[in-house]
Amino acid sequence: MSEECTHDCSNCGAACSSRNAAPQHDAPNPNSSVKKVIGVVSGKGGVGKSMTSALLACAMARRGYHCGILDADITGPSIPKLFGIHGRAMADDKGCWPIQSRMGIDVMSINLLVENEEDPVVWRGPVIAGAVKQFWTDVVWKDVDFLFVDMPPGTGDVPLTVFQSLPVDGIVVVASPQELVSMIVAKAVNMAEMMKVPMLGIVENMSYIVCPDCGKHINVFGDSHVDEVAAKHHLPVLAKCPIDPQLAALSDAGMIETSGGQFLEGAADACEKLLK
């Protein structure tokens, strides 16, 4: 890179070695219309990323937006289970159609395409990444205001494919309170920065549990380190969600849309600002 580079590519010639080419995303299905794409990521598994994706879509749907969820976790899909969806996605000459939840949220997942939802998907990375890409190019996302992409944990093939192929407008990182989270979140944040994808902020899940007798907040996993991690990366903490046994029961029953929790309103506000 030239020492005189100003990083303003609009003022330099096409032959400039430091010039950043505009990202070339894959075109969506011709019948699709998606306003904003939000990636929901985590550095490790088991932090409640899929539940966060589902609750965030529900929160935006309650605000009157038409939402969709692209389940990019091909080998560990859980979105259909959370919404109680067990049907098979249908296709016609226009493309493959997602299945709508009770609230009208469009859902596409590998579990809606396989014969038996308990069958494992034993595919190598490039095939999995290709399937995720097809969920964007072949599926009809019709009149969707917010498409949430529930990504598998880590920084492997699928997140790379999503960042390169989809016009991601923002990323929400889901984390847990443990000190180890600082390194894990840093990996996710650094990948987003490398791919030049905007970060909306961090959601801390399993932040605490509320004592049913006295209402005291108990930090099951010890003191939270998310605030300092967020400050280090100049990111807002969008929400701190408790361990909620009732929410867990609703999720297991496929009734997550009936949850009345308002824990993700801050994250919903951050998403809504993208339209303004």
Please provide the spans of the model-predicted regions.
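C-terminal lobe/tail of nucleotide-utilizing enzymes
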Residues: 1-25, 189-276
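Short glycine/serine/threonine-rich phosphate/pyrophosphate-binding segments
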Residues: 49-55, 77-80, 151-159, 180-184
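Phosphate-binding loop that captures ATP/GTP phosphates
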Residues: 66-67, 72-117, 122, 129
